[in-house]
Regions:
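PLP-dependent amino-acid enzyme catalytic core
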Residues: 1-315
């Protein structure tokens, strides 16, 4: 018996990619985080951050939670806030999809949009606006996925354990997109302890500095890559970064939908493109896992639309 929706977070399935990776010698698998109740990997950390704050006495029902997010953490927090009785304000850049905003509002949270081009320390950025609101609203708290150690700890203890349960030590490479860095830091550290020689690969959009390079510019893929290094991100865990552009990200995502039947989001295309590149070095019988962070629900008017792709010179 499941007594509330938060108990369904985690234990997401792993499936073999039979079409898109058929040219590779190795086996390629995908962990489908869209099966979480809010639709993404961020449900994991949203629940964990709320749970940690409750156990420490930092927050109590009726308080206001505030978070700067690209959307999926906002949905996860809105889910938790709805179940547990918190007010929630999500501060999100304008670039992020309308579907994310509508989902967050449906769960009862408030949305504030900020300029996409505003850099991390700009007074108009979603980070700065969240801090300003926190200083003005009594009994408000920023859980702060960018600095909260519950983020990588959750992936170290739970996500990585699920991977070990599925593969044991028979896994040679894991590929993930990098946003806050929580998933790759937590999963990477745990798997490197348990599986000697495993390669941890990060997917990073052109325009982000996380995977190298100092040229910061806008891009369409949501939820990965930034113009600053989050405090919780331990880049030493990453063996290699693969830089990915919007065109390759979205074309790969569309292929995953059409050829594999996986209704995934745009950054899943970036991670899979990186996996297909990195896994060229693997041999027959070796195994590569790519973590696909969310589903297509948040992007129904974006990359799956031919018109949107044409408007943005991507096809």
């Amino acid at each position: 018996m499941i007594y509330d929706i938060l108990q369904t977070i985690g234990s997401t399935p792993v499936v073999k990619l039979n079409s898109i990776a058929s040219h590779l010698e190795c086996n390629m698998f995908a962990k489908l985080e869209l099966f979480n109740p809010g639709g993404s990997v961020k449900d994991r950390i949203a629940f964990e951050m709320i749970d940690c704050a409750e156990k420490s006495g930092t927050i109590k029902p009726g308080d206001t939670l505030i978070e700067a997010t690209s959307g999926n953490t906002g949905i996860g927090l809105a889910l938790g806030a709805a179940v547990k009785g918190y007010k929630l304000i999500i501060v999100m850049p304008e670039k992020m999809s309308m579907e994310k905003e509508l989902t967050i509002k449906a769960l009862g949270a408030e949305i504030i949009r900020t300029r996409t081009e505003a850099e991390y320390d700009d007074p108009d950025s979603n980070f700065s606006i969240a801090k300003k609101l926190n200083s003005e609203i009594p009994n408000s708290h920023i859980l702060d996925q960018w600095e909260n150690e519950c983020n990588p700890d959750c992936h170290h203890d739970n996500t990585a354990q699920e991977i070990l349960d599925d593969f044991g030590t028979d896994l040679d490479m894991v590929v993930m997109g990098v946003g806050t860095g929580g998933t790759i830091t937590g999963v990477g550290k745990r798997l490197k302890k348990e599986i000697p020689g495993i390669q941890i690969i990060g997917a990073d959009p052109y325009g982000s500095i996380l995977g190298g390079g100092d040229e910061v510019h806008s891009y369409h893929v949501e939820g990965i890559g930034y113009d600053f290094f989050p405090k919780i991100f331990d880049s030493s865990v990453v063996d290699k970064f693969v830089k990915v552009n919007d065109k390759d990200s979205f074309e790969t995502a569309r292929s995953l939908i059409k050829d594999e039947g996986l209704l995934i989001g745009g950054s899943c295309g970036a991670a899979t493109f990186a996996a297909l590149e990195a896994a060229k070095s693997l041999k027959k019988g070796q195994n590569c896992l790519v973590i696909l962070p969310d589903g297509v629900r948040n992007y129904m008017r974006k990359f799956i639309s031919d018109d949107w792709m044409k408007e943005n010179d991507l096809i």
